[in-house]
Amino acid sequence: MNLIESINAAQLRTDIPDFRPGDTVRVHAKVVEGTRERIQIFEGVVIARKNSGINETYTVRKISNGVGVERIFPVHTPRVEKIEVIRHGKVRRAKLYYLRALTGKKARIAERRR
């Protein structure tokens, strides 16, 4: 292992649950406001996972007051306290960008049987 790989391996988190696109997750993100730090919960559907290793990110989409909101989180960031998987969705795509154009019942994702 070269120097860069060893530095990256030291920063990888091991407490990340197994989740895929289509899963509904609850992300507990640390938010700094002035001198205070608090936990903000962002719950939505994972619509994409990109890259690998230390650079891996995932996109979570939710509907807030009738408006679609998406946030991109790095998987291995210390700014995310924990990730809870609420339900596992059954999808046949790796990227669910088509959900942006769907509303109401059309945007629902069936639950995957375990």
From Swiss-Prot:
GO molecular function: structural constituent of ribosome
GO cellular component: cytosolic large ribosomal subunit
InterPro entries, per the entry: Ribosomal_bL19 (IPR001857), Ribosomal_bL19_CS (IPR018257), Ribosomal_bL19_sf (IPR038657), Translation_prot_SH3-like_sf (IPR008991)
Pfam family, one: Ribosomal_L19
Keyword Amino-acid biosynthesis (UniProt): no
Keyword Transmembrane helix carried by entry: no
Gene3D superfamilies on file: 2.30.30.790
GO biological process terms held by the UniProt record: translation
Database matches in PROSITE patterns: RIBOSOMAL_L19
Keywords for this protein: Ribonucleoprotein, Ribosomal protein
Entries under NCBIfam families matching the protein: rplS_bact (TIGR01024)
HAMAP family: Ribosomal_bL19
Role played: This protein is located at the 30S-50S ribosomal subunit interface and may play a role in the structure and function of the aminoacyl-tRNA binding site.
Family per similarity comment: Belongs to the bacterial ribosomal protein bL19 family.
Name listed for the protein in its UniProt record: Large ribosomal subunit protein bL19
Biological source species: Lactococcus lactis subsp. cremoris (strain MG1363)
Gene responsible for this protein: rplS
